[in-house]
Amino acid sequence: DALPISAAFANLHFIGVGTPQQRGSYAADTRYVEAVIEDLVPKLEGDHVIFGKSTVPVGTAAALQAKADALVAEHGNKATVEIAWNPEFLREGYAVKDTIEPDRIVLGTRGNGPDPQPSRAEGIAREVYAPPLAKDTPFIVTDLQTAELVKVSANAFLATKISFINAV
């Protein structure tokens, strides 16, 4: 199990799991994202940032932050955990290229928005993404909800474009 090793030796963790559509519903199934938080957070000690990459409904990151805070309190581990949302924009067949050379980087943190709180996520993101940022890749820092909405909107726009071209 790599999770205890990751918890012990990393202070940045990425969640990139599927969020399929729920059966008989249009809602996203976020149980896999939630499971990562439930499994990882109790093993953490020290300062940690978790970047969510998955497409999730607006409000999920804030709910995951509340869950992480509750797990830290429940397990009594000496950890601070910050959830940030950093959606990916990968084209089919270009995943590696789009990861190394993204056309934009979006980061949602709790340090932005109507009730800002101190955030370590932006500084860490600037370190992680230093190579593309050095090439002037747009870096958009916003609140959690807006970052989630940017990804959902991009997916909806792509689906609309595909529907229109299929109709032609």
Label each residue range with its predicted role:
Residues 17-19, 55, 111:
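Short glycine-/small-residue-rich Rossmann-like dinucleotide-binding loops
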Residues 21-89:
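Rossmann-like NAD(P)(H) cofactor-binding subdomain of soluble oxidoreductases
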